[in-house]
Amino acid sequence: MGIGFGLASLLPAGAAQAVDLDTALKPRIIGDPNAPMHMAEYFSLSCSHCANFHKNTFKQIKKDWIDTGRLRFEFRDFPLRGPAIYAHALARAVPVDAYEGMIDVLLNQQKEWATAEDPVSELARIARIAGIGRDRFVEIIQNRPLLEGIVKIAQKGYDTWSIQSTPSFVINDEDVIRGDVGYEKFLSALNTAST
């Protein structure tokens, strides 16, 4: 069983490769790369629970765990609906140091683009604000190898951790937390994992 969720039908047949795939698909990690603990979040940019996590709980985790050097945090794509894969592609196509900012913008403006009558036009608007012109945006969302790479990240989460919904979190490649749970649940799991 795969996680395609119909995403394969959205992949263009023979789009140009204007994106550096090695850079675009490399892991997106914040925090000390040598931190003793690791948390990976499988998220969809069209998921309202993911947006809520990032607006609330993530800020506290970042302050208490990431910024203190105890945790490295990895963003892993798991697009759930059609336009989400384009949003993930857009985020991965910006420079690596702008990725987290683009994720913030896409999650904070989620209601504007994810539920729009024409979500691709709304994503193009966000791209323009970020300095990405229409032609470049079209190249990004039609880049089949980039889109396939994003699907492979999600598929690996499904195959390895049975990830089927977002947000889902893997702590130290051992424990899985599913859903937008509060900070206290993360605190308990992180404290347990750190001992």
Ranges and model annotations:
Residues 38-41, 72-75, 168-170:
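Soluble periplasmic/extracytoplasmic beta-strand elements of cell-envelope proteins
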Residues 34-51:
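Short active-site neighborhood of thiol/selenol oxidoreductases, capturing the structured segment around
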Residues 1-17:
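N-terminal export signals
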Residues 18-22, 193-195:
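Proteins that catalyze or organize thiol-disulfide redox chemistry
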Residues 44, 125-195:
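C-terminal cap of thioredoxin/glutaredoxin-like
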Residues 20-37:
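A short beta-strand-turn-helix
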Residues 43, 51-128:
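Structural alpha/beta surface segment adjacent to cysteine/selenocysteine redox centers
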Residues 33, 66-68, 162-164:
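Extracellular/periplasmic catalytic domains that process cell-envelope and extracellular macromolecules
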